[in-house]
Amino acid sequence: MTEQVQDENKLIAERRAKLESIRPNCSANAHPNTFRRTHKAAELQEKYGQNTKEELEALGFKTSIAGRIMAKRGPFLVIQDVSGRIQAYAEKGVQADLKDRYQGLDIGDIIGVTGQLHLSGKGDLYVNMEEYQLLTKALRPLPEKFHGLTDQETRYRQRYVDLIVNEESRQAFVMRSKVVAAIRNFMIKKEFMEVETPMMHVIPGGASARPFITHHNALDMPMYLRIAPELYLKRLVVGGFERVFEINRNFRNEGLSPRHNPEFTMMEFYMAYADYKDLMDLTEELLSSIAIELLGSAQMPYGEHTVDFGGPYARLSMLEAIQKYNPDNATIQAMTYEQVKDLEFMRELAISLGIKIEKFWTCGQLLEEIFGETAEWQLMQPTFITGYPADISPLARRNDDNHFITDRFEFFIGGREVANGFSELNDAEDQDSRFKAQVDAKDAGDDEAMFYDADYITALEHGLPPTAGQGIGIDRLVMLFTNTHTIRDVILFPAMRPQA
């Protein structure tokens, strides 16, 4: 056992002893639930922080505050609630009267304090402790330096401690909540209806990904946690709901990385009588408006860069982007779509770029890999990449002028994909053929290929109007708004391997 663990165990034992010592004096419960707060710290700071000492004394304002003790300096306590911090002061007479109970308070304890509001000689507001009540005894100590945890794994495993001691973490999740609320309000104003679709699917679909598998005991059948809500949302458009959206979780049984978590949040929406270009316009309006609403500016820092959400955003085809970011590669500069359709040409090109290829990859998959390796990471400013090949876009409408590609885009900021959208494939026969091609790909070893969904084909046969749909990754968007570089910093409880 390390010295640090021994010290912590000793502190825990001391705190447990303090809790036991107060139990006999508690008529009902050592964790009372009758104290009522009248003000939060920020309310008091905002309303009375500009008053002089004399004005506050003349006012004689009495308040009740509650929160966690974050520091204890002689007669002063620093108390933190959800809004901020304020001090409490045990003047000599009160401290003498309540000396034993006051001395028993520890950093981390949750207390309620009632008293008159004053201003210290340093200009800090404080509440004179005329009365106080221990509401919850903290049995475990907080990290010594309450201005932050340094161990990243502890921050993720014990998010509750991270939120107590790290203001930056708290503000990141406050911003996350604001981003989600702003998106929801924007969509409702645009006359989209919020809906909820199943989280467990009989057939996984709507994206190319490996699903989590579970078992339904009552029905005695396998089921899948959803990888995307797309096919259910489009069924609703078939049913006559012309504008729908859903903000919810998706689950993909894949790797962990700074930009991937197996459980993540998406906002997915569909609008009838629109195409992928309308989606790009709507995305520009959405992001610029919420940036201004939440940050006061369309420009925001991200790492060493300044991201400009003001628009208009760059729009490049995938082939154009590859050529733009490989200016010295003569083969790429001369490449045409006819060559992109040549499987051997694409394999040789990928290998020449140092890409390890899979034998079952199609021309479209090879093009996407080349884009990902050579261009994607350079897209720091908001950029729409269009012209995705049909063989990697099984749910997207083919382009009228070039049937090899689809009317699809992915949206990139900060070198990563944030959104994916396209004009929806509403040709039931074409969708049937593409599902069958996905089944062949799965049989060839592609674990992320889609399943055949006969019920969705039946829905399309009833008629899906011209429709465009898009998914926006909430977690990655929040990473931008909080200037963080790992998805774990914006997910309250990220996936972690259990501790040994």
From Swiss-Prot:
Q: Which residues bind Mg(2+) 1?
A: 410, 417
The UniProt entry's GO biological process terms, in alphabetical order, are: lysyl-tRNA aminoacylation
Q: Which Pfam families match?
A: tRNA-synt_2, tRNA_anti-codon
- The protein's Enzyme Commission number: 6.1.1.6
Annotated catalysed reactions: tRNA(Lys) + L-lysine + ATP = L-lysyl-tRNA(Lys) + AMP + diphosphate
The protein's required cofactor(s) are namely: Mg(2+)
This protein's record includes keyword Mitochondrion:
no
The cofactor note reads: Binds 3 Mg(2+) ions per subunit.
Q: What is its main location?
A: cytoplasm
Q: Name one GO molecular function term.
A: tRNA binding
Q: Where in the cell is it found?
A: Cytoplasm
Amino acids binding Mg(2+) 2: 417
Give GO cellular component annotations, separated by semicolons. Answer: cytosol
Asked if the record carries the keyword 4Fe-4S, the reply is no
What UniProt keywords apply to this chain's record, in alphabetical order?
Aminoacyl-tRNA synthetase, ATP-binding, Cytoplasm, Ligase, Magnesium, Metal-binding, Nucleotide-binding, Protein biosynthesis
* Quaternary structure and partners: Homodimer.
Looking up HAMAP family in the UniProt record yields: Lys_tRNA_synth_class2
Q: Which NCBIfam families match?
A: lysS_bact (TIGR00499), PRK00484.1 (NF001756)
Instruction: Tell me its family.
Output: Belongs to the class-II aminoacyl-tRNA synthetase family.
- Protein name in UniProt: Lysine--tRNA ligase
Source organism per UniProt: Shewanella sp. (strain ANA-3)
